């Protein structure tokens, strides 16, 4: 998918990223790709070294993060195979390192609007029929929800459910990088009559891999070279 692709191994103050980083180009634009679960999908969501991944991208000069993900649907109208570009998240994670605050540094980052509006707009234009907006409930994983939990998430206003957006999104904001996500619905969560299985998720993902690649190939050349959002100044009012 990438022109002139090369693999780069990096170390960070937080340990190693999930895997080697692929550097390459699409449509004349340079980019870096980190498979958050590892190339062999051998890292569980709660074990991903999110800080190392985001630190590495920032060190490489990345200014924007487009994050594909697989999600379950909490709404009947968001059927499997649908793209969703969420606008909010709910954090139900418990054990993850969610900030670069350390060694006396305290970052009170604002995530009132957690996704870059400029990047979301370009992503929606490229995606065409993607669902615009919605709340992503991020759970700890790797297990799926109970029916009671799924009902709770629906009652709380969540529209989709996944395991990786938090703390990836807020770390990107602390790193002053734009962040937007395109989520592929793979299943209806446990609230539906038939409970989700890993086999079902993988089958739907496999059916949509090429669609996601095509979307990224269309999107990346259209991203403005200069940022007009405020993401690059996210720390200005976040520290005392």
From Swiss-Prot:
Gene Ontology annotations for the cellular component aspect, listed alphabetically: cytosol
Superkingdom of the source species: Archaea
Site label Important for substrate specificity, positions: 145, 198
Gene3D superfamilies, sorted: Nucleoside phosphorylase domain (3.40.50.1580)
Keywords: Glycosyltransferase, Purine salvage, Transferase
InterPro entries linked: MTAP, Nucleoside_phosphorylase_d, Nucleoside_phosphorylase_sf, Purine_phosphorylase-2_CS
One Gene Ontology MF term: S-methyl-5-thioadenosine phosphorylase activity
Residues annotated to bind substrate: 163, 187-189
E.C. numbers: 2.4.2.28
SUPFAM superfamilies, per the entry: Purine and uridine phosphorylases (SSF53167)
GO BP of this protein: L-methionine salvage from methylthioadenosine; purine ribonucleoside salvage
Protein family membership: Belongs to the PNP/MTAP phosphorylase family. MTAP subfamily.
UniProt function note: Catalyzes the reversible phosphorylation of S-methyl-5'-thioadenosine (MTA) to adenine and 5-methylthioribose-1-phosphate. Involved in the breakdown of MTA, a major by-product of polyamine biosynthesis. Responsible for the first step in the methionine salvage pathway after MTA has been generated from S-adenosylmethionine. Has broad substrate specificity with 6-aminopurine nucleosides as preferred substrates.
Subunit text: Homohexamer. Dimer of a homotrimer.
Protein name from the UniProt record: S-methyl-5'-thioadenosine phosphorylase
Species this chain originates from: Cenarchaeum symbiosum (strain A)
Phylogenetic classification of the source organism: Archaea, Nitrososphaerota, Candidatus Cenarchaeales, Candidatus Cenarchaeaceae, Candidatus Cenarchaeum
């Amino acid at each position: 998918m990438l022109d002139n692709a090369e693999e780069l191994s990096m170390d960070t103050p937080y340990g190693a990223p999930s895997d080697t980083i692929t550097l390459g180009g699409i449509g004349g634009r340079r980019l870096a790709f980190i498979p958050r679960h590892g190339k062999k999908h051998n890292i569980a969501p709660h074990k991903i070294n999110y800080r190392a991944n985001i630190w590495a991208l920032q060190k490489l000069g990345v200014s924007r993060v487009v994050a594909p993900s697989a999600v379950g649907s909490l709404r009947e109208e968001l059927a499997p195979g649908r793209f969703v570009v969420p606008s909010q998240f709910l954090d139900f994670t418990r054990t993850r390192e969610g900030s670069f605050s350390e060694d006396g540094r305290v970052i009170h980052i604002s995530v009132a609007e957690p996704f870059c509006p400029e990047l979301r707009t370009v992503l929606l234009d490229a995606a065409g029929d993607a669902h615009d907006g919605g709340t992503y409930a991020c759970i700890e994983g790797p297990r799926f929800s109970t029916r009671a939990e799924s009902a709770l998430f629906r009652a709380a206003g969540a529209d989709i459910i996944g395991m990786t957006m938090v703390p990836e999104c807020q770390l990107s904001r602390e790193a002053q990088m734009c962040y937007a996500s395109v989520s592929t619905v793979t299943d209806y969560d446990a609230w539906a009559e038939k409970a989700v299985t890993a086999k079902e998720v993988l089958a739907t993902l496999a059916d949509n891999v090429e669609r996601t690649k095509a979307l990224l190939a269309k999107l990346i050349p259209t991203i403005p070279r200069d940022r007009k959002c405020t993401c690059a100044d996210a720390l200005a009012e976040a520290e005392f």
